[in-house]
Amino acid sequence: NDVGLLTGSFLKKTALDVLDGNPDINYGSIYENAVAQELRAHGFDLYYYNSKKLGELDLLIQDRNDHVLPIEVKSGKSYKRHRAMDNVLAHPEYHLNTGYVLGPCNVSVEGNVTYLPVYMAGMFHNE
C-alpha cells in the first residue's frame, strides 16, 4: 500500500481535486490506504474481515497483548455509522472489547468505540 502510488494512478482532474480539497471527492480509498500504510510501517500485519451476516471491516490488527482490534476508516460526516463494527463488537464469540474508527473527527469515546482523526493512525505501535 502506497498513498503516492494510489493518487498517482488517478486521472489528472481527480488528482487536482484531491490536492484542492474538493469536498465532492470520495476520500475513502485514500484514507484507508494511508491508515494501512501507517499501521504496516509500525509492525502490524493487516487483516480484512467480511461476513455476509455481520458486515465488512476495513482492518483488523493484533496488538502485542494478542488483542484483536477492529478498525474502520471513514472519510465522510457519517463516520459514526458503522454497522459492521457494532455487529462484531456485540458478537458473543469474538470477545472484542473496543473498536476504533479513524475519520474526520476529534478524539472521543462512545461506548466501546474510540474515534480518532486519521492522522493518529501512527499512534498504534506493535514493537
Predicted regions and their residues:
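A cross-kingdom feature that marks ATP-driven nucleic-acid transaction machinery
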Residues: 1-127
